[in-house]
Amino acid sequence: MKKEQLGKNLKYMRECHNMSQSQLAGKLWLDRSSISGYEIGKRMPDILILWEMAEIMNVSLDELVGRKKMSKAAGL
C-alpha cells in the first residue's frame, strides 16, 4: 500500500463527507496533525485506525487504501 494513495483517498473521502481534518481526528481520538500526516503521505495509520476510517467513510478497507475502486454505494 502506498502512503500517497491512501492520503489522496482519505482526503477525497473526508471532503466528500464535508468533514474537516479536526472533525475526523475527533471521531478517531487523534490529533488533527495525524490526519494531515496521513493525507500528505508522511505517516501511515495502524490497521485499527484504517478500519475505523473505512467505517466512518462507509467504504471497504480495500477502497480506502486504493486496492479497489470506490463503490457508488459509498455515496462518493
Task: Name every feature range the model reports, one short phrase each.
Residues 63-76:
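Short, charged recognition helix plus adjacent turn
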Residues 48-63:
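DNA major-groove recognition helix of helix-turn-helix/homeodomain DNA-binding modules
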Residues 18-37:
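Short alpha-helical DNA-recognition segment
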Residues 1-5, 43, 72-74:
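A detector for short, charged/polar N-terminal pre-domain segments
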Residues 1-16:
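A short, Lys/Arg-rich alpha-helix, primarily the initiator
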Residues 11, 15, 29, 40-42, ...:
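Residue-level detection of the helix-turn-helix DNA-binding "recognition helix"
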Residues 15, 26, 55:
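Alpha-helical residues within the helix-turn-helix
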